[in-house]
Design a protein with these regions (language model features):
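ATP/NTP-dependent adenylation/nucleotidyl-transfer catalytic domains that generate, transfer
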Residues: 2-44, 49-263
Length: 263
């Protein structure tokens, strides 16, 4: 059994290496064949943008990649520290553009129209759209392609913002589930430690409101990914997925989100 486990580990690592190298090749080919001089992305201090940054540098070289941290009042200091640390490790051009002035401007412009209405995800989405606009402005000015950083799990259930973090020219992780994102990050760090360990281990958060984590809105990613895979890739029905041992409430919620967002 020891040899079997060893073989399983080797096969797993081979899969992760193959997927990572395919993502690197995809980025390099796409930019090269379309004539883009380089790439830029929003670096949040989270694992998705960290992995995309590593892939971009491996594909293009650090001199052709620009990372932009766009902190809001809800951005944790450790997110800033981790983004700076990762940019330093990879040697990319890095800058910080706070979005608080943009948030204040939108609040002022929309105050008459929003009068009497409670705050909700609208205000969260405005933050994402400010960031998307900043990245697209930099893209227009420099010719660099914006790489979006959302993963398959988030995109499938709509845990992202149209015209916000979805804005860009290439979605590098569009077919990579969140659980695989973690495995790919671990694999890349086994080659050389470019992703700060805290980025991998801390709970994921969009940081669009105080104390927010992804699991406030979604089931644990291990559960989410398994349900998405069963439904989307294997065509299982809700009763069949529930019969596999998943909580009915989780299955119904995930399938509802999938249906709402599949347009």
């Amino acid at each position: 059994t020891g040899a079997l486990r060893q073989g399983q580990v080797a096969a797993q690592q081979a899969l992760e290496a193959e997927v990572y190298q395919a993502l690197v090749l995809g980025v390099r080919d796409y930019l090269g064949k379309n004539g883009f001089p380089g790439a830029l992305l929003g670096l949040s201090g989270g694992i998705d943008s960290a992995l995309v940054l590593a892939i971009a540098v491996d594909a293009l070289g650090a001199d052709k990649v620009r990372a932009v941290m766009m902190p809001s009042p809800y951005t944790a200091e450790i997110s800033l520290a981790d983004a700076r640390d990762m940019a330093r490790r990879l040697g990319v051009r890095y800058e910080e553009i706070p979005i608080a002035p943009g948030m204040a401007a939108f609040e002022t412009m929309l105050a008459p129209a929003f009068s009497g209405l409670p705050a909700d995800t609208t205000e969260e989405n405005i933050q994402a759209r400010i960031r998307g606009s900043l990245l697209m402005a930099l893209s227009n000015k420099t010719g660099a392609l914006v790489l979006t950083t959302g993963n398959k799990s988030e995109i499938a259930v709509g845990y992202c913002t149209l015209y916000g973090d979805m804005a860009g020219g290439l979605a590098v992780l569009k077919d990579v589930k969140k659980t695989l994102v973690y495995r790919l990050a671990r694999w890349r760090n086994s080659v050389s430690s470019v992703i700060p360990e805290r980025i991998i281990t801390r709970p994921p958060s969009a940081e669009l409101k105080p104390g927010q984590t992804d699991q406030d809105s979604l089931p644990p990613y291990e559960t989410l990914d398994a349900i998405v895979e069963a439904y989307v890739e294997y065509g299982r029905s809700a009763p069949e997925i529930i019969a596999q041992g998943f909580a009915e409430a989780d299955v119904r919620r995930v399938l509802s989100l999938l249906r709402i967002n599949e347009y």
